[in-house]
């Protein structure tokens, strides 16, 4: 599978939806990347922690990347938006 197919983009939906999507990818024995921007970053961290502590206890963090993206706002100004990518390795 490609890297984009193993990515879960966290947004406004309930946290457990993202936990289940991530769990399905990890159960195939593949790595999964949880991505989020802005206010959804805390939800992405929640997804990973719920997964590690309640469902797939052997899941490991493989990599965590933090970045800032510049987006053009409605008024034409550039806004800085934080983003996170958390790579999870399946349990052994």
What does each of the following model-derived ranges do?
Residues 1-26:
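Histone-fold modules and their flanking histone-like tails across chromatin and transcription assemblies
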């Amino acid at each position: 599978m490609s890297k984009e197919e193993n990515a879960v983009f966290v947004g406004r939906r309930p946290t457990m939806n993202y936990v289940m999507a991530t769990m399905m990818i990890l159960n195939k024995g593949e790595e999964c990347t949880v991505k989020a921007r802005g206010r959804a970053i805390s939800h992405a961290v929640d997804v990973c922690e719920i997964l590690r502590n309640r469902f797939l206890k052997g899941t490991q963090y493989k990599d965590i990347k933090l970045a800032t993206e510049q987006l053009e706002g409605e008024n034409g100004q550039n806004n800085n938006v934080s983003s996170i990518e958390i790579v999870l390795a399946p349990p052994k």
